Curated annotation (Swiss-Prot):
GO terms for molecular function: small ribosomal subunit rRNA binding; structural constituent of ribosome. PROSITE patterns: RIBOSOMAL_S18. InterPro entries: Ribosomal_bS18, Ribosomal_bS18_CS, Ribosomal_bS18_sf. It comes from the Bacteria. Pfam families: Ribosomal_S18 (PF01084). GO terms for biological process: translation. Gene3D superfamilies: Ribosomal protein S18 (4.10.640.10). GO terms for cellular component: cytosolic small ribosomal subunit. The gene is rpsR. Binds as a heterodimer with protein bS6 to the central domain of the 16S rRNA, where it helps stabilize the platform of the 30S subunit. Part of the 30S ribosomal subunit. Forms a tight heterodimer with protein bS6. This is Small ribosomal subunit protein bS18. Belongs to the bacterial ribosomal protein bS18 family.
Length: 91
């Protein structure tokens, strides 16, 4: 079966796909970070979901080396009460 062609189908190809996903890249590799610090709360909060869960690497694009450091840093920050365990513990 031949592909449909014509003016109508060209317009569809030119429209931006609403399900388009941006190419994932590791923020830490791009920034040249050696070690992720548990005291850097702004960075850690970017990788914690609204329900308090750590966002997986397959969604963020973080490399496994940095994902392990990120998990450890978030868990340390939680233990020291710098970051809440869940969204239920807001002050």
């Amino acid at each position: 079966m031949p592909r449909p062609t014509g003016k109508k189908f060209d317009k569809r190809r030119q429209q931006q796909n609403p399900l388009f996903k941006r190419k994932k890249f590791c923020r830490f590799t791009a920034a040249g970070v050696d070690h992720i610090d548990y005291k850097d709360l702004e960075t850690l909060k970017d990788f914690i979901g609204e329900n308090g869960k750590i966002t997986p690497a397959r969604l963020t694009g973080t490399k496994s080396h940095y994902q392990r450091q990120l998990d450890t840093a978030i868990k340390r920050a939680r233990f020291l009460a710098l970051v809440p365990y869940t969204d239920q513990h807001k002050a």
